[in-house]
């Protein structure tokens, strides 16, 4: 599983390839398990952010904290497009730009969903 292929280019960076290098015969599903944990944790964060945004009064510090966690998780598996959206969202939080946060969060959810589908296909194809 050392080549993430063209369909994943732009979605995953070298961090994902480093995870693949840690996978061995003793733990053949390591990358898939790490990815599953990422999607479980990120679903929780998306839910928390959704709830915070639905309140209408924006707590930019709380939103930034959630997004900081999301960015860290995304960085750890090499989710480059999701990570980029996290960075943009945090910039809007620091600027107090609610509309920018809302717009970026929609794009982040789209990139996250696309990544999930691509990884599911990738793991199925590599079995």
UniProtKB/Swiss-Prot annotation:
Its post-translational modification remark reads: Two-component system major event consists of a His-to-Asp phosphorelay between a sensor histidine kinase (HK) and a response regulator (RR). In plants, the His-to-Asp phosphorelay involves an additional intermediate named Histidine-containing phosphotransfer protein (HPt). This multistep phosphorelay consists of a His-Asp-His-Asp sequential transfer of a phosphate group between first a His and an Asp of the HK protein, followed by the transfer to a conserved His of the HPt protein and finally the transfer to an Asp in the receiver domain of the RR protein.
Keywords attached to this Swiss-Prot or TrEMBL record, sorted alphabetically, are:
Cytokinin signaling pathway, Cytoplasm, Nucleus, Phosphoprotein, Two-component regulatory system
Summed up, the tissue specificity of this protein is: Predominantly expressed in aerial parts of the plant.
Q: Is the keyword Metal-binding assigned to this protein?
A: no
Q: Which residues carry this modification: Phosphohistidine?
A: 68
**Compartments reported by the entry:** Cytoplasm, Cytosol; Nucleus
Superkingdom of the organism of origin: Eukaryota
**What's the short name of a Pfam family annotated to this entry?**
Hpt
Q: Which Gene3D superfamilies match?
A: HPT domain
An annotated GO cellular component of this protein is:
cytosol
Establish whether keyword Nucleus is in the entry: yes
GO BP, sorted A to Z = cytokinin-activated signaling pathway; phosphorelay signal transduction system
Q: Which GO terms describe its molecular function?
A: histidine phosphotransfer kinase activity; protein histidine kinase binding
Occurrences of domain HPt (ranges): 27-122
* Protein purpose: Functions as a two-component phosphorelay mediator between cytokinin sensor histidine kinases and response regulators (B-type ARRs). Plays an important role in propagating cytokinin signal transduction through the multistep His-to-Asp phosphorelay.
Its subunit composition reads: Interacts with the B-type response regulators ARR1 and ARR2.
Q: What is known of its domains?
A: Histidine-containing phosphotransfer domain (HPt) contains an active histidine that mediates the phosphotransfer.
Protein name (record): Histidine-containing phosphotransfer protein 4
Protein source organism? Arabidopsis thaliana
Biological classification of the source: Eukaryota, Viridiplantae, Streptophyta, Embryophyta, Tracheophyta
Primary gene name: AHP4
